[in-house]
């Protein structure tokens, strides 16, 4: 009876963890989608460590939700095969999350390097491409910055007029405020340092969250293994 009572407690805790996994899965998907939207607005393009991280987060979130569903079915029916499958796949998810967390830490400086290269490349296209101009203007206005390293970077763009910066560099944005500008009226700090630092910080936050979720998943694996052992022993946990 004591064993059966203990296993009922384990089963209840497993249900609680499964609900937590579902919540974490939804959270991961939301964070991944949000990060992807942010990166799409900061012109980080191509299959780079920075741009692939949101995709990995979304994939892990979807997979975690499916695995939690399998675990719920296995716990309800006390099905040995389903619980084994749940434990194995949860272990795989945990390994992916730990790997993603490590990758996020290792490539935190790479994210800034990618952003710097892309930002300078797109500055060249600013006068030629309205879509690029719109993205750069939004970034400069939102982060209160101007140019890559500083506002003088705009002077190096051949197609830009002399003594001119985009209007989005102005402290108080008005039409034509960037023409023959006064240095006191524009943001002097570069966008690479401001936005790149923000990106690195958020990569580390996501990495820390992944490690936290992985710790909870360890508990899920332990409880699942306990339930599997109980099922094999023939105890009634209902």
Curated annotation (Swiss-Prot):
Q: How is it modified after translation?
A: Palmitoylated at a low, basal level in unstimulated platelets. The level of palmitoylation increases when platelets are activated by thrombin (in vitro).
What GO cellular component is one of the record's annotations? azurophil granule membrane
Span(s) of short sequence motif Lysosomal targeting motif: 234-238
What are the glycosylated positions? 130, 150, 172
Q: Tell me which parts of the chain lie in the Cytoplasmic compartment.
A: 2-11, 73-81, 225-238
Which coarse location class applies to the principal site listed for this UniProt protein?
A: membrane
Keywords carried by this UniProt record: Cell membrane, Endosome, Glycoprotein, Lipoprotein, Lysosome, Membrane, Palmitate, Protein transport, Secreted, Transmembrane, Transmembrane helix, Transport
Q: Which residues lie on this side of the membrane: Extracellular?
A: 33-51, 103-203
Q: Which CDD domains match?
A: CD63_LEL
Does the record carry Membrane as a key word? yes
**UniProt-listed GO biological process terms:** cell migration; cell-matrix adhesion; endosome to melanosome transport; epithelial cell differentiation; negative regulation of epithelial cell migration; pigment granule maturation; positive regulation of cell adhesion; positive regulation of integrin-mediated signaling pathway
Q: Which residues cross the membrane?
A: 12-32, 52-72, 82-102, 204-224
Report the subcellular localization: Cell membrane; Lysosome membrane; Late endosome membrane; Endosome, Multivesicular body
Q: Name one Pfam family in it.
A: Tetraspanin
- How does this protein lie in the membrane? Multi-pass membrane protein
Identify the Gene3D superfamilies for this entry: Tetraspanin
Q: How does it assemble?
A: Interacts with TIMP1 and ITGB1 and recruits TIMP1 to ITGB1. Interacts with CD9. Identified in a complex with CD9 and ITGB3. Interacts with PMEL. Interacts with KDR/VEGFR2; identified in a complex with ITGB1 and KDR/VEGFR2 and is required to recruit KDR to ITGB1 complexes. Interacts with SYT7.
Query: What task does this protein carry out?
Result: Functions as a cell surface receptor for TIMP1 and plays a role in the activation of cellular signaling cascades. Plays a role in the activation of ITGB1 and integrin signaling, leading to the activation of AKT, FAK/PTK2 and MAP kinases. Promotes cell survival, reorganization of the actin cytoskeleton, cell adhesion, spreading and migration, via its role in the activation of AKT and FAK/PTK2. Plays a role in VEGFA signaling via its role in regulating the internalization of KDR/VEGFR2.
Q: What is this protein called?
A: CD63 antigen
Source organism of the structure: Homo sapiens
- List the gene name: CD63
């Amino acid at each position: 009876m004591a064993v059966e009572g203990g296993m009922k407690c384990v089963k209840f805790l497993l249900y609680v963890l499964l609900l937590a996994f579902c919540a974490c899965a939804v959270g991961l998907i939301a964070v991944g989608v949000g990060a992807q939207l942010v990166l799409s607005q900061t012109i980080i393009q191509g299959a780079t460590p920075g741009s692939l991280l949101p995709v990995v987060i979304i994939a892990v979130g979807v997979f975690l939700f499916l695995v939690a569903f399998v675990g719920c079915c296995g716990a309800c029916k006390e099905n040995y095969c389903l619980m084994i499958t749940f434990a194995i796949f949860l272990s795989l998810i945990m390994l992916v999350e730990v790997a993603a967390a490590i990758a996020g830490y290792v490539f935190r400086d790479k994210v800034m390097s990618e952003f710097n290269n892309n930002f300078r490349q797109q500055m060249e296209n600013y006068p030629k491409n309205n879509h690029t101009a719109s993205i750069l203007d939004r970034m400069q206005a939102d982060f209160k910055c101007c140019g890559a390293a500083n506002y003088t970077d705009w002077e190096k763009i051949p197609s830009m007029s002399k003594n001119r910066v985009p209007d989005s560099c102005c402290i108080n944005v008005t039409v034509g405020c960037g023409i023959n500008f006064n240095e006191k009226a524009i943001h002097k700090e570069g966008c690479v340092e401001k936005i790149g630092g923000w990106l690195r910080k958020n990569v580390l936050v996501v990495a820390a969250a992944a490690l936290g979720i992985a710790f909870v998943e360890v508990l899920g694996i332990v409880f699942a293994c306990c339930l599997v052992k109980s099922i094999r022993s023939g105890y009634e946990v209902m």
